[in-house]
């Protein structure tokens, strides 16, 4: 602690924010271990693990936004953190989606029952709201000059383009990410996690300045809940409907349209 106090205020703030993010990861990791040992009912087990995974993702992303403001002159710093914590989430949250669109994809493709999907969706939404209360309590302690309670209560609109472009950006980001998620399943786990982290970083770089490139309805609800209250229709369409449409388009293309096109070509060749 004395070593931390000897640093410049800006460096102190950065270290505190990074420390909080690592504490979230350690807390959730410990809670997941306990849940695996103590919870044996599949539904309760799935709910708790999905709740914890979404909680970690949302809390870390809240703090990541703070870090991006601390060194806004160097955008590569933010991208580096996005890549690093995407790796951390990928390694520590195995077996969970932390994204309603991911659950929807699994249900449509038959990898998850509707009942289990509903349980996971409920866990994600409840966790997204709980993470806001946790972050609000932490920020009220004013551990850094960027931590203040009013910050989480205000609507900080992340949409910096017209609505039609915002919808397209979120839909395309969701399409690309879930396409990779589907087609990287056969890739070795360690390599897959790096590839997905790199893709998330690229999408954040490409669309982050316009919409935040969230492509995750639960995360959007946690980060921008006051905006959903004030501008519900706009935020519902951009951050909930558009990513869902992106996933549906991806499933239609890779599961129906491309196989149909391939079968037609094979039939024509035989004729």
UniProtKB/Swiss-Prot annotation:
GO terms for cellular component: cell surface; cytoplasm; cytoplasmic vesicle membrane; endoplasmic reticulum; endoplasmic reticulum membrane; plasma membrane. It comes from the Eukaryota. The chain crosses the membrane at residues 15-35, 42-62, 77-97, 167-187, 195-215, 235-255. It is found in: Endoplasmic reticulum membrane; Cytoplasmic vesicle membrane; Cell membrane. Gene3D superfamilies: Glycerol uptake facilitator protein. Residues 1-14, 63-76, 188-194, 256-271 are cytoplasmic. Belongs to the MIP/aquaporin (TC 1.A.8) family. AQP11/AQP12 subfamily. This is Aquaporin-11. The lineage of its organism: Eukaryota, Metazoa, Chordata, Craniata, Vertebrata. The gene is Aqp11.
């Amino acid at each position: 602690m004395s070593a931390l106090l000897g640093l410049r205020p800006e460096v102190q703030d950065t270290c505190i924010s990074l420390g909080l993010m690592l504490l979230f990861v350690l807390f959730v990791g410990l809670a997941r271990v306990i849940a695996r040992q103590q919870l044996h009912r599949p539904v309760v087990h799935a709910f708790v693990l999905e709740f914890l995974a979404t909680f970690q993702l949302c809390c870390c992303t809240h703090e990541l936004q703070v870090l991006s403001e601390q060194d806004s002159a160097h955008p590569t710093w933010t991208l580096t953190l996005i890549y690093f914590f995407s790796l951390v989430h990928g390694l520590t949250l195995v077996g969970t989606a932390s994204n309603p669109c991911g659950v929807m994809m699994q249900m449509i493709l038959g990898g998850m029952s509707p009942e289990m999907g509903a349980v996971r969706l409920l866990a994600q939404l409840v966790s997204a709201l709980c993470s806001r209360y946790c972050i609000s309590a932490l920020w009220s302690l004013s551990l850094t000059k960027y931590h203040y309670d009013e910050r989480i209560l205000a609507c900080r609109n992340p949409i910096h383009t017209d609505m039609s472009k915002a919808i397209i950006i979120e839909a395309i980001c969701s399409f690309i990410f879930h396409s990779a998620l589907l087609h990287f399943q056969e890739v070795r786990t360690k390599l897959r996690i790096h590839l997905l982290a790199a893709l998330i970083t690229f999408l954040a770089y490409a669309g982050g300045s316009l919409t935040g490139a969230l492509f995750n309805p639960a995360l959007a609800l946690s980060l921008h809940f006051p905006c959903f209250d004030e501008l519900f229709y706009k935020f519902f369409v951009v951050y909930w409907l558009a990513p869902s449409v992106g996933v549906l388009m991806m499933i239609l293309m890779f599961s129906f349209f491309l196989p149909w096109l391939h079968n037609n070509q094979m039939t024509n060749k035989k004729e």
